[in-house]
Amino acid sequence: MFQCFLYIRDPNNASEVDGNHYAMPLTISPVVSAETMKVTRIDILPTGVDNTIKEPSPYKVQPPNEYIPEAQNIRMDVKPLNVVQPEGASFQVTNFSEQGRAIAWQKWEFKVGFNQREGMVLYDVHYDGRPLFYRLSLSDMNIPYADPRHPYHKKAAFDLGDAGAGIMANNLQLGCDCLGSIYYLSAVLNDDKGEPLHMPNCVCIHEQDAGIGWKHTNYRTGRAAVVRNRELVLQSIITVSNYEYILAFQFNQAGEVMYEVRATGILSTQPIDEGISVPWGTVVHPGVLASHHQHIFSLRVDPMIDGPINRVVYDEAHPMPRSDFNPHGVGYTVNETPVTISGGYDQNWDANRIFKIQNASVKNPVNGKSVAYKIIAPPFQKMLADKDSFHFKRAEFADHNIYVTSYKDGELYAGGKYTNQSRGGTGVRSWADRKDNVLDDDIVVWVQFGINHVPRIEDFPVMPCEILKVALKPVNFFEKNPALDVPPSVQSFNKSVLASMNHGQEVSEAVVGEKAAVCCVKEQSKL
């Protein structure tokens, strides 16, 4: 059965097919049989402060609330900002199969695939020839809504399991979705009849400047050493009905991998009586309610940190007790605890708990520590739905920051293989409950992150990007900062220019020593 929510176009501008119909929700909700494709009943939606159902009344036309550019008074003071690489991009793309592509960039090497459910998947990630990750992908996503009334209590979308990050991917356009020197990847999936479905430009690859990578100024001599932090970005954008997700893997020159999610698009809306408010949502337009909801993501990390046998440990910082050795009470230590059995594990922000994926058999030649990559994920509020609710039972990944499981073929999706009308019991929580050994074994790490989206009126008619990022960073993996060999940031390379007093762009390049002098590394060193 399908519970359908209906909207209308602006009756005063019905020919505008791109009008924002989410600003005009209706109070009727047909229920359609998936077997017969016929309407079995029509529910009347509650629109007040409780679950009382009112008799339908003529629709009251509200003013439109549009997001399309032609409906706005566009700013006229935005000047061009061009991303130019006169010698082209620094990455190379080669074919290793009919569909797969291999990427090489700044000591990084990996393969890229694309499938119907996960969308973009990375394989065999190496840095300077050393293995790091066998497979990286966004495994699952759940969006449970907060309205407890029928029929809204059913709203809990699995945007990957129910729809698919691959099949919902946008055709990315040059100059719109990615800026600079762009390389596009296309894919071939299949439609619901098993026929080939061409997905053009579903991934864009480009470089971006991410600010300063590292810097130090010798205050004794005034000499500054500084490098820029350049990133390689692989980006895909999916549209799942009203919502957009901008999904990107990012690599930098310091051996770090990031996974970034930008949530944007339009809120899922429902009708509400004028002049009232409810504690489970925000009124964003006259007669329009946007319910509170969570976005909970699960990133699947299949590691091979210097080899296939890995473990997960976590560090915690604790104060040292006062003693003759610590008479002033300022000392603290960091303790490491291994994770030995599969299960769900959580952050402890008070102890600065940091999870690391470690290879205990490979030691750093400088300090003797085990080589590792640490997981840095933003804090998020875990699933708020009751543990006996179907929301909680179905989203098996939504109750812990980290899950660690032993590797098993076919265990790819944290919410289970089939999420549509699922009952739970087939996802990562169930796999972790096997209590397998995960100490020095072939393991998989599942990293959860997300947001509790309490809508604000600024999120409508289209929401500014909400940005989330997970980082995988080396810990005692290298012998020193791996970005030391990045070319210094100098004016002769970067070609920056001075802006005039009225903020117009000068045609001449900036020169060190002029007004608003540029701070760069000396190009000649005495060392």
Which residues make up each language-model segment?
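Noncatalytic N-terminal accessory/assembly modules of large enzymes
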Residues: 1-2
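Extended effector regions of multi-domain proteins
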Residues: 7-254, 262, 266-275, 282-527
